[in-house]
């Protein structure tokens, strides 16, 4: 299955998707273009599936993907394990988001089409978790 390039290099695309996925987990919904929303949905579904597993390996995999801007410098400058605090996004994923979908097998997110953006007529969408 292919993916969308979103007119970016690999590193820019990876950073964009990480940021949008983290914002979706922290805020519960994001407003972005349709193409970005469809790509973020794929990553968010994978993160929620990891959250449902709930073991240490899944937590570590989620921590490598999700980003927490405030703690990123602390992690880089950490000298021992006690200095590394668990990211807020990872905590939210495993304690709030994943338990909501314990009995659901996929389809954790929903995309609403919002119409076109005023400046460049890009198709916009609202990506949110299913209740």
Curated annotation (Swiss-Prot):
GO cellular component terms listed in the entry, alphabetical order: cytosolic large ribosomal subunit
Keywords for this protein: Ribonucleoprotein, Ribosomal protein
InterPro entries in UniProt: Ribosomal_bL17, Ribosomal_bL17_CS, Ribosomal_bL17_sf
Keyword Secreted: no
GO molecular function: structural constituent of ribosome
Coiled coil: none
GO biological process: translation
Pfam families, A to Z: Ribosomal_L17 (PF01196)
Keyword Transmembrane included in the entry's annotation: no
Domain of life: Bacteria
Membership in a protein family: Belongs to the bacterial ribosomal protein bL17 family.
HAMAP family associated with the record: Ribosomal_bL17
Subunit-level organization: Part of the 50S ribosomal subunit. Contacts protein L32.
Name of the protein: Large ribosomal subunit protein bL17
Encoding gene (name): rplQ
């Amino acid at each position: 299955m292919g993916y969308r390039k979103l007119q970016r290099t690999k590193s820019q695309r990876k950073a964009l998707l990480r940021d949008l996925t983290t914002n979706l987990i922290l805020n519960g919904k994001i407003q972005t273009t349709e193409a970005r929303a469809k790509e973020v949905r794929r990553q968010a579904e994978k993160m929620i599936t990891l959250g449902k597993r709930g073991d240490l390996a899944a937590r570590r995999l989620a921590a490598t993907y999700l980003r927490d801007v405030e703690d990123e410098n602390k992690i880089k400058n950490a000298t021992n394990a006690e200095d590394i605090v668990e990211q807020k996004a990872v905590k939210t994923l495993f304690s709030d988001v994943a338990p909501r979908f314990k009995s659901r097998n996929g389809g954790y997110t929903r995309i609403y089409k919002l119409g076109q953006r005023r400046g460049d007529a890009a198709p916009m969408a609202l990506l949110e978790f299913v209740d």
